[in-house]
Amino acid sequence: MTSLTCGAAVITFNGMKHLPQQLDSIATQTRAVQHIVISDDNSTDGTWEYLENWAKHASIRVTLVRNQPQLGLIANFEQAVSMVEADIVFSSDQDDVWLPNKVELVAAVFERHPDVQLVHTDADLIDGSGRELGTTLLTELMVSDRERIAVREGKAYEVYFRRNLVTGAAAAFRKNILDLARPIPNVLYHDAWLAFMASAVGKVHLLDVPTIQYRVHGSNMVGVEIGKRKQNMLEKARSFYWALNGKNELAKNINHALSRRTVLYERLSSHPELSPHYKAMASEALQFAQRRQALVSTPRNPVGRTIAVLRNAVRGHYRKYSAAPWSESLRDILNR
């Protein structure tokens, strides 16, 4: 079994509150990373000065980069992962904590399965003070057995067309998928984009155990809505009522989906070596988003909308490309 080199890409911005604990957790892994790239987006709270001192004493090779002016989240991430010199790249937020055997567990999956391009894992959720919240990332995302089976059977892309399950802080990928993934578009989160790219060229593996403590607080770049799965029927009905009466929000969401699916289809279409089936799904998903956009852009016509929605439903498009098929189809019919 081939031994792979591992590296970490850490992006920072004004992260002094939690950064020392995160860096210590990376540096004390049971299986060491060979290279750490830390790309700082022009912090002003002492983060950069701390990084310079930390790098001088680190036992691991460290590359520091300071962006002046700022690049923003996605461009900073792309810069960091591109600079890592390793077979496997572990992406890292500045405020989480790696469990001691994270690299060991994840690297073993890549070494056992050469066709796996990306591994993502569960995470224990903690609050801003580091207290455990008694739940995990996949639990709060309400990942179903059906979704787990699809990923395990090499059909992760069928899941990702409906919704993203990959959180970058709990993921690692083979660096060579950056050949397809770059440049990373700014119309969707980089972890969702990498999940699509990985599933286009190989398999994705869901490691159903926590490998990090994921910090949930008000400053999260990408947060988790704790407790959503515990809503009672009245709360769900109230949420659905407001969704039905939010035409502008619905149009915004559909336009966003259209932008995401456009860039995905264009990227896949520019690579003839990729699976025709995957490209066909990307094309179908794009056409579905285009039809939904046209639907909500026209004056409300319950009969016409119902016919259009039923046509999409019969084709299986809501089931294949919507995270909540029933509620989204009803919104398309009833939204004012």
Predicted features along the sequence, with ranges:
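C-terminal subregions of glycosyltransferases and related glycan-biosynthesis enzymes
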Residues: 160-161, 186-188, 192, 204, ...
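Nucleotide-sugar donor-binding/catalytic module of glycosyltransferases
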Residues: 1-231, 330
